Swiss-Prot record:
<dbReference type="GO" id="GO:0005737">
    <property type="term" value="C:cytoplasm"/>
</dbReference>
<feature type="active site">
    <location>
        <position position="129"/>
    </location>
</feature>
<dbReference type="InterPro" id="IPR016162">
    <property type="entry name" value="Ald_DH_N"/>
</dbReference>
<comment type="pathway">
    <text>Alcohol metabolism; ethanol degradation; acetate from ethanol: step 2/2.</text>
</comment>
<dbReference type="GO" id="GO:0052814">
    <property type="term" value="F:medium-chain fatty aldehyde dehydrogenase (NAD+) activity"/>
</dbReference>
<dbReference type="GO" id="GO:0050061">
    <property type="term" value="F:long-chain fatty aldehyde dehydrogenase (NAD+) activity"/>
</dbReference>
<dbReference type="InterPro" id="IPR015590">
    <property type="entry name" value="Aldehyde_DH_dom"/>
</dbReference>
<dbReference type="GO" id="GO:0004029">
    <property type="term" value="F:aldehyde dehydrogenase (NAD+) activity"/>
</dbReference>
<dbReference type="GO" id="GO:0030149">
    <property type="term" value="P:sphingolipid catabolic process"/>
</dbReference>
<protein>
    <recommendedName>
        <fullName>Aldehyde dehydrogenase family 3 member B2</fullName>
        <ecNumber>1.2.1.3</ecNumber>
        <ecNumber>1.2.1.48</ecNumber>
    </recommendedName>
</protein>
<keyword id="KW-0560">Oxidoreductase</keyword>
<keyword id="KW-0520">NAD</keyword>
<feature type="binding site">
    <location>
        <begin position="107"/>
        <end position="112"/>
    </location>
    <ligand>
        <name>NAD(+)</name>
    </ligand>
</feature>
<dbReference type="GO" id="GO:0006629">
    <property type="term" value="P:lipid metabolic process"/>
</dbReference>
<dbReference type="InterPro" id="IPR016161">
    <property type="entry name" value="Ald_DH/histidinol_DH"/>
</dbReference>
<feature type="propeptide" description="Removed in mature form">
    <location>
        <begin position="383"/>
        <end position="385"/>
    </location>
</feature>
<dbReference type="InterPro" id="IPR029510">
    <property type="entry name" value="Ald_DH_CS_GLU"/>
</dbReference>
Length: 385
């Protein structure tokens, strides 16, 4: 990557100052199972493009993709710069014992803490792309059918197994009554009268996740859906109402096609509710009032934000993607992926001569040369000089 020149002050006009991007070295990528190709290969390409060598650990949960990656990648890539390691938590733990130059992990906050703890042993820098409970506020002035279309699409996409999917809706009881029939209409239009047979609705990744999600169906009251089929690992697109903050469905990231609705009376109450929780990976607000959307944006914190829209921003390579606080640290996508896997090294190349010009920097310092230094360095009052 070409170096990036940077501006200088008067005393450095003869110097060359630039940012040199160099590879970290050996990078460990621990990939997730929900989008096992995209969330593996995007990172692999970024790390290799930055010049690093990669140890790639695909998720053992998406077994088919794990096997394909292990078999196909060595056929097309130089094996001296990467390795694919198969296995489960034990193998991942063994990898984390080694001295690495960078770790990129995508997964749950619980495992993210394990990864970060292991990284501290060698002070290894990390990017953690974690999850969270993503709120979706719906204002009373919204058209319920428009909201239903957009929320149902990005809630049930990939059977809800998406880290930026809405985890719950916040709205007034009045909006809930208008929203429920609209959601039912949308679900039928998207997936038909028998969603289980729809080619447009995904199923749950494995039995463990299925059992976890089916247990959540017992929370609150099922207003839409609620059906399940263990042999098919099918959970119907579901909406829960009368949901309390203390219930299990509100205590963990759902990561499935279940949408709880929590009642609030105002945008202020919604914001207070959101700010009582950990910072989410994404936050959504629907309102015909730009003031309401801006309030939600300005008075909360999240990895990303969508006003009157879902997670379509993740398709853009021009903006970074990442969490904040409990939902992660670091960023990637597009050039940001390259930058994540690069050490940004500040470089200054000065002439070997011209010593007379440098003497102004040396002690003893008089009032005159201090004034000259301040003038030559500009108004950088927070620098050493």
């Amino acid at each position: 990557m070409k170096d990036e020149p940077r501006s200088t002050n008067l005393f450095m006009k003869l110097d060359s100052v630039f940012i040199w991007k160099e590879p970290f070295g050996l990078v460990l990528i621990i990939a997730p199972w929900n989008y096992p190709l995209n969330l593996t290969l995007v990172l692999l390409v970024g790390a290799l493009a930055a010049g690093s060598c990669v140890v790639l650990k695909p998720s053992e949960i998406s077994q088919g993709t794990e096997k394909v990656l292990a078999e196909v990648l060595p056929q097309y890539l130089d094996q001296s710069c990467f390795a694919v390691v198969l296995g489960g938590p034990q193998e991942t733990g063994q990898l984390l014992e080694h001295k690495l130059d960078y770790i990129f992990f995508t997964g749950s906050p619980r495992v993210g803490k394990i990864v970060m703890t292991a990284a501290t042993k060698h002070l290894t820098p990390v990017t953690l792309e974690l999850g969270g409970k993503n709120p979706c506020y719906v204002d009373d002035n919204c058209d319920p059918q428009t909201v239903a279309n957009r929320v149902a699409w990005f809630c049930y996409f990939n059977a809800g197994q998406t880290c930026v999917a809405p985890d719950y809706v916040l709205c007034s009881p009045e909006m809930q009554e208008r929203l429920l029939p609209a959601l039912q209409s949308t679900i039928t239009r998207f997936y038909g009268d028998d969603p289980q047979s729809s080619p447009n609705l995904g199923h749950i990744i494995n039995q463990k996740q299925f059992q976890r999600l089916r247990a959540l169906l017992g929370c609150s009251r099922v207003a839409i859906g609620g059906q399940s089929n263990e042999s098919d690992r099918y959970i119907a697109p579901t909406v829960l109402v009368d949901v309390q903050e203390t219930e299990p469905v509100m205590q963990e990231e759902i990561f499935g096609p279940i949408l709880p609705i929590v009642n609030v009376q105002s945008v202020d109450e919604a914001i207070k509710f959101i700010n009582r929780q950990e910072k989410p990976l994404a936050l959504y607000a629907f309102s015909n009032s730009s003031q309401v959307v801006n309030q939600m944006l300005e008075r909360t914190s999240s990895g990303s934000f969508g006003g009157n829209e879902g997670f379509t921003y993740i398709s853009l390579l021009s903006v970074p993607f990442g969490g904040v606080g409990h939902s992660g640290m670091g960023r990637y996508h597009g050039k940001f992926t390259f930058d994540t896997f690069s050490h940004h090294r500040t470089c200054l190349l000065a002439p070997s001569g011209l010593e007379k010009l440098k003497e102004i920097h040396y002690p003893p310092y008089t009032d005159w040369n201090q004034q000259l230094l301040r003038w030559g360095m500009g108004s950088q009052s927070c620098t050493l000089l």
